[in-house]
Amino acid sequence: MVKEYKTITQIAGPLVFVEKTEPVGYKEIVTINLPDGTTRRGEVLDSSSDIVVIQIFEGTTGLDKECGVVFTGETLKLPASIDLLGRILSGSGEPLDGGPRIVPDQLLDINGAAMNPYARLPPKDFIQTGISTIDGTNTLVRGQKLPIFSASGLPHNEIALQIARQAAVPGSESAFAVVFAAMGITNEEAQYFMSDFEKTGALERAVVFLNLADDPAVERIVTPRMALTAAEYLAYEHGMHVLVILTDITNYAEALRQMGAARNEIPGRRGYPGYMYTDLATLYERAGIVKGAKGSVTQIPILSMPGDDITHPIPDLSGYITEGQIVVSRELHRKGIYPPINVLPSLSRLMNSGIGAGKTREDHKAVSDQMYAGYAEGRDLRGLVAIVGKEALSERDVKFLEFADLFEQQFVTQGRNENRTIADTLDIGWKILAHLPENQLGRIDNKYIQKYHPAHRKGQ
């Protein structure tokens, strides 16, 4: 027999406090019955004392102490089916595209669990995004978690959509899917995401979850877990390689802070909960490859750094959990460069596992290292030119200064719909490296220079 409690003691922000007489499970789903016959859903946040703390998904406006509370004994579940592909859903899994509700093959608990480290396989297969600054110098590897560090006003949404459209595991295109989850976005951004997915045809192999800024903060905490549960289902039940794009993790962390404040928790750094590191890890650590499974889950979380501060707790803690970072640069954006990705502070820690002969191309690492070194030197020389002028530079220094400009104009810059193969990316790299004297290409083996350098290829 289902019991209805009418023992609400307090309503504060998105939280309802209920006196209980029987044990209640953590994260148990609750139904709130209003006097007008409508219902709302909530989730148990704390059941350690006689007072249960419940967060309400639809907000607490209109609730009072006369409302009935029913504990369902179930956790929040995703209706999982292969029919998820091609659908646009709300942050809590409700259809936004006018289609029917998903008829589930399984109902999966969205809280999931981090992978057993013993069951993990090391990531080693290249994922092609079609963006040279990622594929060429900060390669994404299947099973990796590689965040994009951006900032307010920078085109991280455009970059996210371009990756969603273009990403593929070469040779496994038929088994590749994208799960895209946006948190705390405006209605305008939601329309932009929906129309882009529909116009470009990317929706056919994607599942999209959209949580709007005016949706309850509680739903923002649920959204990435819905997305990751969908990804795990497609990966481990249907053998697909799934790329999960989560944007914007900063909005997720703000929702955590808001919920912590509503519960009168003692805040940590800059007002964020002390458990934020652990909470972020429960999201990021759901990426990977499991022994015996055909599919995999790869993550690209996108976060906007408040005040462009890379030491802010959100990027700082994310950096400890993830395997590198792609940094979007305001300086390059001001120059009109798209995508404005700065390769110097960017890093993919698993890059060397996913490149080379049989994966990308034998010269990949050498070309990447040489371009990185040349661009770093050219950037340093720009600072020197600002002090002493270009006339004071040697002929060699001028070549590196010009190389930095070519790198930004030809390698970094590409169209929003330009999908470069890894061969295209490396060939562009060789084209701009040809601007440097051969005796300055010290990071590239001579056999690769003889095989791929434009000056030698012409004679072949």
From Swiss-Prot:
InterPro entries: ATP-synt_VA_C, ATPase_a/bsu_AS, ATPase_A1-cplx_bsu, ATPase_F1/V1/A1_a/bsu_N, ATPase_F1/V1/A1_a/bsu_nucl-bd, P-loop_NTPase, V-ATPase_su_B/beta. CDD domains: ATP-synt_V_A-type_beta_C, ATP-synt_V_A-type_beta_N, V_A-ATPase_B. It comes from the Archaea. PROSITE patterns: ATPASE_ALPHA_BETA (PS00152). Keywords: ATP synthesis, Cell membrane, Hydrogen ion transport, Ion transport, Membrane, Transport. One of its GO terms (cellular component) is proton-transporting two-sector ATPase complex, catalytic domain. It is a peripheral membrane protein. It is found in: Cell membrane. Its main location: membrane. One of its GO terms (molecular function) is ATP binding. SUPFAM superfamilies: C-terminal domain of alpha and beta subunits of F1 ATP synthase, P-loop containing nucleoside triphosphate hydrolases. It holds the Pfam family ATP-synt_ab_N. Gene3D superfamilies: 3.40.50.12240. One of its GO terms (biological process) is proton motive force-driven plasma membrane ATP synthesis. HAMAP family: ATP_synth_B_arch. Component of the A-type ATP synthase that produces ATP from ADP in the presence of a proton gradient across the membrane. The B chain is a regulatory subunit. Belongs to the ATPase alpha/beta chains family. Has multiple subunits with at least A(3), B(3), C, D, E, F, H, I and proteolipid K(x). This is A-type ATP synthase subunit B. It comes from Methanosarcina barkeri.
